[in-house]
Amino acid sequence: MWMNFESLQIARAYLFGEVKYLDLMLVLNIIDIITGVIKAWKFKELRSRSAWFGYVRKMLSFLVVIVANAIDTIMDLNGVLTFATVLFYIANEGLSITENLAQIGVKIPAVITDRLHVIESDNDQKTEKDDQAAG
């Protein structure tokens, strides 16, 4: 079967723009899925339904990048919004992979785990403030 990769590149450029690190985001998504499955298998929590929803969430993150690219194009932001969105998802995947590896039993350097705790506590505080403001 012959595939026209030039057409794929055109579609990629149209949907995602010329954003950097999109390939890294894809690779980290795959690594996160693999480490998540290993973690779930280790703790005997491997469920096809919850895994399926996890995969859908991963795909939807690319949809968010497409929307960010559309907004970027309409507002003539030169790719800033799309780039920031991709960086957000890269950081999120990196954190998730690190958490999965730590729960599996892989030793993680203290600098990284300390930073994870700071980010996690910042997120918890923000969630509490949002809940108080809404309620």
Curated annotation (Swiss-Prot):
Per the entry, what this protein does is: Produces a lesion in the cytoplasmic membrane allowing the phage lysosyme to attack the peptidoglycan.
Q: Which family does it belong to?
A: Belongs to the bacteriophage holin family. Cp-1 holin subfamily.
Signal peptide residues on this chain, from the entry's feature table: none
Gene Ontology cellular-component terms for this entry are: host cell membrane; membrane
Q: What is this protein called?
A: Probable holin
Q: Which InterPro entries match?
A: Phage_holin_4_1 (IPR006480)
Q: Which GO terms describe its biological process?
A: killing of cells of another organism
Protein's organism: Bacillus phage phi105
Give me the segments passing through the membrane. 24-41, 62-84
Q: Which keywords are on file for this protein?
A: Cytolysis, Host cell lysis by virus, Host membrane, Membrane, Transmembrane, Transmembrane helix, Viral release from host cell
